[in-house]
Design a protein with these regions (language model features):
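Short, hydrophobic alpha-helix immediately C-terminal to the catalytic nucleophile
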Residues: 3-4, 57, 70-71
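S-adenosyl-L-methionine-dependent methyltransferase catalytic module, highlighting the catalytic core
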Residues: 67-72, 79-164
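A short SAM/SAH-binding and catalytic strip from SAM-dependent methyltransferases
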Residues: 52-65
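Active-site micro-motifs of SAM-dependent methyltransferase domains
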Residues: 41, 61, 89
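Short, well-ordered alpha-helix to beta-strand connector turns
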Residues: 31, 51, 77-78
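A short acidic, Gly/Pro-enriched loop at the edge of an enzyme's catalytic core
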Residues: 44-53
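Class I SAM-dependent methyltransferase SAM/SAH-binding core
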Residues: 1-42
Length: 164
């Protein structure tokens, strides 16, 4: 959906990567360029500095080596935009305190069938970027409706559902 929006409204040329045949078919029906590719195999098939911007939307938590994938994204692109569900959100914390793994609109799967294998918080992501010497140019924290607020900005690790 993001690539379709960017293509239609911002005249962006881009490529999506996906493994799911249904998702690939939907992209093609919308006129979005898509390549069947497993992100867990890395991005070696792309030359360095191939793209101005590389975007990963709500996928970081489901890859085997998110740290290596971030470095690969920066190898093939000048900048990256990454979004992920914030596992530090108060609703997630409350469910854990009640003895359950979180299930919510932005984390809809039960613990036994989730594709999410590396859940992280906003703070965890920032620590990883610092460890990898990745400079975060801009941060945005939003609720489950993708809206920001002054309150979320005060305590993003606790109050945001997603981080960009």
């Amino acid at each position: 959906e993001l690539l379709s929006y960017l293509k239609t409204n911002k005249s962006v040329t881009g490529y999506g990567l996906d493994l799911d045949a249904t998702n690939i078919e939907q992209c093609l029906q919308k006129g979005v360029n898509v390549i069947e590719h497993d992100l867990n195999r890395g991005l070696d098939s792309f030359a360095s500095n191939s793209f101005a911007i590389v975007v990963m939307t709500e996928t970081l938590q489901s890859v085997e080596a998110p740290d290596q994938l971030l470095l690969e994204m920066l190898r093939i692109g000048n900048e990256c935009i990454v979004s992920f569900p914030n596992f530090g959100n108060w609703r997630c914390r409350l469910q854990i305190a009640m003895g359950n793994m979180p299930v919510s609109q932005h984390l809809p799967n039960s613990w036994f069938d989730t594709p999410n294998i590396h859940l992280c918080t906003c703070r965890d992501f920032e620590v990883l970027c610092k460890k990898l010497s990745i400079n975060i140019i801009e941060k945005k924290y939003v609720n489950s409706q993708h809206n920001s607020s002054p309150l979320i900005k005060v305590a993003p690790n606790l109050l945001s559902a997603f981080a960009f």
